[in-house]
Swiss-Prot record:
Keyword tRNA processing in record: no
Compartments where found: Membrane
Source species of the chain: Alternaria alternata (Alternaria rot fungus)
Family recorded in the similarity comment: Belongs to the cytochrome P450 family.
Residue ranges, compositional bias (Low complexity): 495-504
One GO CC term, this protein: membrane
Protein name stated in the entry: Cytochrome P450 monooxygenase ALT8
């Protein structure tokens, strides 16, 4: 609204200049309107960034982060450190947060309201979920890449889309996809093993790995790989086959066009960071209009993906489509695309948006979690060895025959491998792929008993909640899978609308007693884990993502030993993290691997 007011003021200035005629000949229309525009913008920033938060905001009584706002050192951390890190440090330094809300100031002094307590989170995500929507700067930034799918839809549009798509992500259906995921994991392991042998024999061919280190002399020596790239290609193949019935072949071909296109979109750069900051200060349409190389590359990449999605939809509408390859998925009638088409609720362009959403969000987030899982395995060889022992004792050698017995695979992974499930839960807790997200109050409303004016920017920070010492005990900042093995369930009562797999737990508030390895009070609410959010806007694909991580991690650790490559930081805080859609390592993650015989 402020931007429109400034533009309107500038237009009025132009009209006034024309009306006054000769009396304003010394001043061009452009400079006159520019002066008015600049002045109005300046006044608005002074009001919104200085006067309002200091003297008029009804939120000024809340606990506020000291020295934040107006280019202060604390505020600049929000733009120079990994997302969620400053907020996490702020919260853990506070003695208490009575209202469950913490206020801080952004780069120009604008108010931000960080939701901290499980009770406040429940109010925002469940009780008043549609009163807090994604702000325009988030929607505009993501819409180009994700399309206007279920992730970005709001209100009745979101309810309708989620209702149509939910059967494709029901846990019962996801269990039927375990063999498909396992077959992709087998393909990944086989391909990696073969390429290790190729590189070990000093072949000049490098179809999978990139390395600037000396290559191994025999198969038991280490070679260096970019595991982040391999994770991304594997998850892209899984979402392709299990999600929309398409085989992309990204594992087989490292130069796969779709994979390379997504690499181009998610590639971090100083230019991308600068454009992101400008979107906070200037009209978003203006920033996207700027003739920058980054904008041009993203626009070309998005057009490529949209064209591919249209082609997939046309092929899916053909009568013979169901009888073609991957009938094991297509015959269920429950992959994302077949369900969406059968519903008749989407136009072809709306279907394109849905496919774009699940292709991008469905593979990038899980790939990020898997990359960090391998990183933590390198840092904790004891955890890696313990997990490998469980995998080898519970799952058959590769290649296996689970394609003919899907229920056995799902049952084994979900209920027969407690340490694998504990590691995966801890990965999602400790390394949420999306560490911070935003909401905006669409009207004057409340969070618990605190009045929140319309337009207030709300910060939901999974990294903060997931590592909060008041919820997780004194070892909240440590990676500790054993905390999940010490969880003692009593009579559980779930009052949230979303569910998840039995092995990973549901979502919602429940009456359970938890103890961690430090014998201190731990989380008593599912809102202490915010990786997939909760309520009507929780991640529709969380069961899919959890199964994907468990299967791929089991296969990788079962076959290979992992160590950090030379030059890869041994401290998590020293790893340069992308400030893009997900918190993945900015330059990939280079690790050393070798085959461990016997599985």
């Amino acid at each position: 609204m402020a931007t429109l007011a400034c533009v309107g003021a500038a237009a009025m200035a132009c009209a006034l200049a024309v009306y006054l005629g000769d009396t304003t000949k010394s001043m061009s229309y452009l400079s006159y309107s520019g002066t008015i525009l600049f002045g109005c913008s300046g006044l608005w920033y002074v009001w919104k960034g200085l006067l309002w938060p200091a003297y008029f905001s009804p939120l000024r009584h809340l606990k506020t982060v000291p020295k934040s706002g107006w280019l202060s050192a604390e505020t600049l951390r929000l733009y120079t450190e990994p997302r969620g890190v400053p907020q996490c440090e702020w919260i853990n330094k506070l003695d208490s947060v009575p209202q469950g809300l913490v206020r801080y100031r952004s780069i120009l002094g604008f108010e931000r309201l960080l939701v901290v307590s499980p009770e406040a989170l429940a109010d925002v995500l469940v009780n008043r979920s549609y009163e807090f929507q994604k702000p325009a700067f988030v929607v505009t930034q993501l819409e180009q890449i994700l399309g206007r799918g279920v992730l970005l839809a709001e209100g009745n549009e979101h309810r309708a889309q989620r209702r149509v798509l939910l059967p494709a992500f029901a846990f019962r259906h996801v269990k039927s996809l375990y063999p498909v995921m396992w077959s992709v994991a087998e393909h990944l392991i086989t391909s990696m093993t073969e390429n290790i042998r190729v590189e070990s024999s000093a072949s000049p061919t490098e179809p999978v790995f990139s390395s600037d280190e000396p290559q191994a002399k025999h198969k038991h020596e280490m070679i260096t790989v970019n595991i982040a790239d391999l994770c991304s290609r594997a998850t892209l193949d899984i979402i392709g086959i299990a999600g929309i019935g398409q085989e992309f072949g990204a594992i087989r071909n490292p130069n796969n066009a779709l994979h390379q296109t997504y690499c181009e979109i998610f590639q971090p750069s100083k230019e991308a960071t600068l454009l992101g900051v400008l979107r906070l200060l200037l009209p978003i349409w203006f920033v996207d209009w700027l003739p920058s190389r980054r904008n041009a590359r993203v626009q070309r990449a998005v057009q490529t993906i949209r064209s591919l999605c249209r082609q997939i939809i046309q092929e899916e509408r053909l009568p013979q489509a169901v009888d073609e390859s991957h009938s094991e998925v297509a015959s269920t009638g429950k992959n994302i695309l077949t369900l969406a088409i059968a519903s008749g609720a989407f136009t072809d362009e709306a279907l394109v948006d849905q496919i774009m959403t699940f292709l991008a969000a469905g593979h990038e987030t899980t790939a990020t979690a898997l990359t960090w899982a391998i990183y933590i395995m390198c840092l904790h060889p004891g955890i890696q060895e313990k997990l490998r022992n469980e995998v080898r004792s519970r799952l058959p050698k590769l290649p296996s025959t689970y394609n003919s017995a899907p229920q056995n695979l799902a049952k084994t992974i979900d209920t027969g491998m407690p340490y694998l499930n504990a590691v995966c839960q801890e990965v999602f807790r400790y390394f949420p792929p999306i560490p911070v997200t935003f909401r905006e109050a669409t009207k004057n409303t409340f969070i618990l008993n605190t009045a929140v004016p319309a337009g207030t920017k709300i910060v939901l920070a999974p990294r903060v909640t997931n590592r909060q010492s008041t919820l997780w005990g004194s070892n909240a900042q440590e990676f500790d899978p054993d905390r999940w093995l010490c969880l003692k369930k009593q009579d559980a009562s779930i009052d949230d609308s979303s569910a998840a797999s039995p092995s990973f737990g549901g979502s919602g508030k429940r009456k359970s007693q938890y103890t961690d390895t430090h014998k201190e009070p731990s989380t008593r609410s599912n809102f202490a884990t915010m990786t997939f959010l909760h309520g009507p806007r929780s991640c529709i694909g969380q069961s899919f993502a959890k199964a994907e991580l468990a299967i791929l991690l089991a296969a990788l650790v079962g076959r290979f030993e992992f160590k950090l490559a030379r030059g890869t930081p041994e401290k998590e805080i020293d790893v340069r993290v992308s400030r893009g859609a997900t918190a993945r390592p900015e330059k990939g993650l280079f690790v050393q691997i070798r085959v461990i015989e016997g599985w």
